[in-house]
């Protein structure tokens, strides 16, 4: 049985949420909070990828983290012993999603679709070492060759 749940989002009335249109094979809209004005309401917009026409959600990155003191202030009736807290792992989050419009898997980082770009956009040390794109690193993390087409990846 193949069932699917569809979510939509309406961020047009939320202040301090940036809307970025992105076109690859099809069009996407990426919703991100404004880092200078992040609030508890906008923190859920760390990176949401939607269909720009229907607002169907394709990818929803975990919301912005909060400090223990902020959490305790917001939820004073919850005891610390009921939760496990982990250290934040720094790095670029890569989100995998399925786009039913084109029947393909795709990846997104916070600000773009596809992963065909580098963490270091320029070479500062002059060695011009070859860099792997986020897409290539993602493929290698799954045990595939860096140039494998997503259509040939068992997900």
What kind of region is each of these model predictions?
Residues 1-155:
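Core nucleotide-handling region used for phosphoryl-transfer chemistry
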């Amino acid at each position: 049985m193949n069932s699917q749940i569809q979510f939509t989002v309406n961020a047009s009335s939320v202040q301090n949420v940036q809307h970025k249109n992105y076109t690859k094979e099809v069009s996407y809209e990426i919703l991100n909070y404004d880092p200078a004005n992040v609030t508890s309401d906008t923190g859920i917009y760390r990176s949401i990828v939607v269909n720009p026409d229907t607002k169907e959600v394709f990818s929803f990155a975990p919301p912005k983290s909060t400090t223990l003191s902020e959490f305790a202030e917001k939820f004073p009736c919850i005891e610390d012993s009921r939760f496990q807290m982990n250290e934040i792992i720094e790095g670029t989050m890569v989100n995998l999603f399925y786009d039913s419009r084109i029947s393909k898997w795709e990846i997104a980082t916070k600000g773009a679709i596809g992963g065909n770009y580098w963490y270091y956009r320029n070479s500062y040390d002059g060695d011009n070492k070859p860099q792997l794109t986020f897409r290539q690193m993602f493929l290698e993390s799954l045990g595939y060759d860096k140039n494998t087409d997503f259509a040939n990846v068992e997900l």
